Amino acid sequence: IRGIFLTHGHEDHIGALPYVLQAVNAPVHATPLTLGLIKLKLEEHDLVSKTQLVTHHPGDVVKAGCFSVEFIHVNHSIADAVAFAIHTPVGTVIMTGDFKIDPTSEDGMTDLGRFGMLGKEGVYALLCDSTNVERQGYTPSESVVSESLDRHFKGCKNRIIVTTFASNMHRI
């Protein structure tokens, strides 16, 4: 194993990492926020000093054996999410990770231009996460959520208690 590549810092994507790293010695590649969350998790298992954590940004390309892994910006409910274009000897494999299309996101729009360019070049396989794909319609923009919260907050005279994913920093 030449490397472990993580798309974002949600628990369902990084939670098993301490257990994997007890069996596999490989560098961990991710974006800054994702690595920050990973570091906290590794501290719980006394693995930080034993693990090579490598910071990347959208647009970076990492060589891993005969593969190169390209980081592509995507929008998700956690900042610093990426997809991967894995360039292999037989073709390009795209792993989207979790993503959404939100043109008003504080974290920037998913890089549809790069996905389009890769599509024109030819994609051997697309591995695409698709939460709620069975629902009709589309996911509303975060700006709609923000407007709704503003209306409720302005009308409240006392305490307001709100719950949300702690990793959804833009909403917080």
Task: Name these PLM-found stretches.
Residues I1-F5, H10-I172:
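His/Asp/Glu-rich metal-coordinating catalytic cores
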